[in-house]
Amino acid sequence: MGKLSTHVLDTAHGTPAAAMRVELYRIAASGTPELLKRVVTNLDGRTDAPLLSGDEMRTGIYELQFHVAEYFEGRGAELAHEPFLDLIPIRFGIADEDGNYHVPLLVSPWSYSTYRGS
């Protein structure tokens, strides 16, 4: 069976992004998001368990929401009253229930990058 995982790296400090709040949503055909999980990254910037695995893995559209402003404020970063990046949504599709989907996020208070990992 496949699985979904993530890994968040803080490129401003050169460290894993520990204690970042992440939410996983499944997007219904109507476009309505359904909250599946709320997690917090561990000391390695990962989740302690896959976000989806086994019977939870279904084809469809999903969205990960990363609470980056909250994370950087917790690290003591001086952010504007309206931070440039607050919440980063990454919407993606799962086409193969048996596939491994890894969604890394490399992030600073001013930029981010993602890709499909393995």
From Swiss-Prot:
Catalytic activities: 5-hydroxyisourate + H2O = 5-hydroxy-2-oxo-4-ureido-2,5-dihydro-1H-imidazole-5-carboxylate + H(+)
> Which superkingdom is the protein from?
Bacteria
A Pfam family annotated for this UniProt entry? Transthyretin
Its GO biological process annotations read: purine nucleobase metabolic process
EC number of this enzyme: 3.5.2.17
Q: Molecular function (GO) terms listed? A: hydroxyisourate hydrolase activity
In which residues is substrate bound? 7, 46, 115
Q: What else is known?
A: HIU hydrolysis also occurs spontaneously, but more slowly.
- Cite the record's note on assembly: Homotetramer.
Full protein name: 5-hydroxyisourate hydrolase
